[in-house]
Amino acid sequence: VTQEAVNVRKEERGYNKALLWNHEQQGMDKLTDTIFFDKSLSLFAFEFGQADDGRDIGEDIQTRMWPSLAIAVPVFIIGMLANITFAMLMVFFRASYLDLSGVILCVVLMSISGLFYLIGGQFLAGKIMQLVPLSGYAQGLDAFKFVILPVFIGIVSGIGSGSRWYRTLFLEEVSKDYVRTARAKGLSEIRVLFVHVLKNAMIPILTGAVVVLPTLFMGSLILESFFGIPGLGSYTIDAIQAQDFAIVRSMVFLGSVLYIVGLVLTDISYTLVDPRVRLDG
């Protein structure tokens, strides 16, 4: 592609202007005749504009967010519960062969490529056993047979790293004084772990949960593209491949907003799980 062709494409799409401040203009045009003012300022009012094919991006987001949520929410909730439970079991049997076996299993699961889970799961469940469709999506209850395999793969692929991280958090807590005090009062080990240790480990758990908040809305880029699910993840991938900057810009902005909202919600949730934390400082 020649530089001339690049310049023509930029001019056609309005990207030949200055980014934030146009020195070539006079007065307020220095500020308004910029890419930021023309393309990005409207995003703060959640006006996403139109894609290159003329489709309304806001309507596409409203339509595509539900398939993304159908995958991301179960993966997040079930995956977190599975990781915490598995980590608690390893901590319960800590310094034993069961704990060592669990750690080895976590390392093995972490070492396997994500693409292997996708290809292997699709090949076994979809092609060999023919339990679920290989790809596609449907509305209503029919969507269950299309999302169950991506959800399962999303959960299994994250168990290794998630459980190992939670195990580290819980092991750090079990050596503290309040745990020894709880045991001295005659509480069972199960109650100590799932009531006292888990409660005091909630702050780092909540902090880690913030990172995945944008994916709850925007979906998984690889999962949706691989299984042909019309969610926001595949929407973003298609936009990148088509060089549709309007869609890419909108999705990046949306992800940033969700991340900031997640940080605020996390700070609020700290006050719920730990009475020592106060928002007023």
Residue ranges and their predicted role:
Residues 1, 104-133, 153-157, 164:
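Membrane-water interface segments at the C-terminal ends of transmembrane alpha-helices
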Residues 1-33, 129-146:
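Hydrophobic alpha-helical transmembrane segments of membrane transport/permease proteins
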Residues 17, 26-39, 56, 96, ...:
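Coil-to-alpha-helix initiation sites in intrinsically disordered, low-complexity, charged segments
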Residues 23-80, 84:
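An internal, D/E-rich "acidic patch" concept
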Residues 38-42, 122-123, 154, 224:
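Generic alpha-helical structural context detector
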